[in-house]
């Protein structure tokens, strides 16, 4: 098992996210539990390219202080929604013989959705801990509606096991 922390970058990790305090607490708790139980924590950052708001070299590109990686923890950069496409993550997980990926981070309706579905298609058991992903309101849905749609309907029982933070930690302890 690994804990995959997706796109928790300074530019977009803020109180405008749906249920921010619960999200922040869940992610911090899971990162600490993973480290305590020798579950590898892997980070992914999104780069929209030169001239975009979210691009390498600007302060907002770096990982949010509250979730920051420790020395030696892997960081993969991506340019598309999926954490698996063209990043080396897939090859790394296969090489390490990883079968289970717990996914946390941003944004529910973009990169988390793509990462969960692509991970599932690559044969990984995907775990989505409750309150450990979030998003913003958009033109069609509130952040809350997006969160509930994906976590309680789209992924659950199809692409991922959607469980509590506590259940996720129990799985970490058994690894």
Task: Label every PLM stretch briefly.
Residues 48-52:
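Glycine-rich, proline-tolerant flexible connector loops at the mouths of alpha/beta enzymes
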């Amino acid at each position: 098992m690994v804990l995959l922390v997706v796109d928790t970058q300074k530019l977009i990790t803020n109180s405008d996210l749906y249920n921010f305090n619960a999200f922040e607490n869940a992610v911090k708790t899971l990162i600490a539990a993973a480290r305590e139980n020798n579950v590898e924590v892997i980070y992914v950052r999104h780069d929209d390219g030169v001239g975009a708001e979210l691009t390498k070299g600007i302060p907002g590109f770096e990982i949010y202080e509250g979730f920051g990686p420790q020395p030696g923890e892997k960081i993969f950069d991506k340019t598309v929604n999926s954490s698996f496409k063209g990043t080396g993550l897939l090859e790394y997980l296969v090489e390490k013989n990883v079968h289970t990926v717990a996914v946390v981070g941003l944004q529910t309706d973009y990169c988390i959705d793509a990462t969960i579905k692509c991970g599932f298609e690559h044969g990984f058991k995907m775990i989505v801990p409750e309150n450990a992903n979030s998003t913003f309101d958009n033109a069609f849905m509130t952040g809350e509606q997006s969160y509930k749609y994906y976590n309680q309907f789209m992924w659950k029982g199809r692409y991922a096991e959607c469980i509590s933070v506590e259940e996720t930690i129990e799985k970490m302890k058994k690894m």
